[in-house]
Amino acid sequence: MSEISDAEKVRIASDFIKHAPPGEFNEVFNSVRMLLENDDLLKNKCVNAIAQYNVGQFVPVKLDGVAKQTLITPYNDLGNGRFYDEVSKKSFKYDHVRKEAADLQPHPAESGITEQWRQALQTQLDIYIDDHYAKSGTGVVFARNGVFTICIESHQFQPKNFCNGRWRSEWNVPVGDGKSGSQEMKGKILSQVHYYEDGNVQLFSEKEPVLKVNVSADFDKTAKEIIHAISEEETIYQNAVQENYANMSDTTFKALRRQLPVTRAKMDWNKAQTYRIGQEMK
């Protein structure tokens, strides 16, 4: 890349970083480092791309002395590299390259009814995560300026099996504004999987559902209804992805199979649907 300007090098390197598959950031980062051959340029000019990647992927992080992980998201970003954990009420400095938290400091909770709503939602979300996500799930309810957002992340990284994947979802929860009755709840669900044994199959799926939920002054009852609605919608989405993938096995993958013997790929396309790409994350 010696004939390319530094600005163009940064643009190309940043694009590679921001599109790294789940669980493969280190491999992409090291490859970019070799291409740039300039650690100062990588450290000083590509750090924004690394931060965007971590925030966009809802990367989980463990805080010292805190039982459960929290997430790196736009909804708990305090700026200047600091984030906060809603459960422990601590803010921390996050190293986007090392993916480590440091300098924990007390962080004030939202006051009064806002924190009551947040705790009720977090209690029900914890139950849902424990019941439906395979060990690696993390769910956090963020409350900021009276606005509630539920973020969920789950991943399965299996490099020995040449397969990595991540599930993310976020939900804007319509509580805390004094309104009751049927309210609109908007969400976004994303799943991304990379299978790469003697071939390269990437699954990226996104859906932005809009649900109706009943909101009342009863914190616990409303929280249960909201998490139940999320559970139903995420199950519908998961089943639809699996069904579409099974259909692709009989259409798209069969068309590809005629060309694959030239590459001597080992993947059995007839059994593609049995690989359960995306399913093991939830």
From Swiss-Prot:
Gene Ontology CC: cortical cytoskeleton; dynactin complex; F-actin capping protein complex
Keywords: Actin capping, Actin-binding, Cytoplasm, Cytoskeleton
Cellular compartment(s): Cytoplasm, Cytoskeleton
Gene Ontology molecular function: any one: actin filament binding
Family matches, as Pfam families: F-actin_cap_A
Stated family: Belongs to the F-actin-capping protein alpha subunit family.
Quaternary assembly: Component of the F-actin capping complex, composed of a heterodimer of an alpha and a beta subunit.
Function of the molecule: F-actin-capping proteins bind in a Ca(2+)-independent manner to the fast growing ends of actin filaments (barbed end) thereby blocking the exchange of subunits at these ends. Unlike other capping proteins (such as gelsolin and severin), these proteins do not sever actin filaments.
Designated name of the protein: F-actin-capping protein subunit alpha
Record organism: Caenorhabditis elegans
Protein encoded by which gene: cap-1
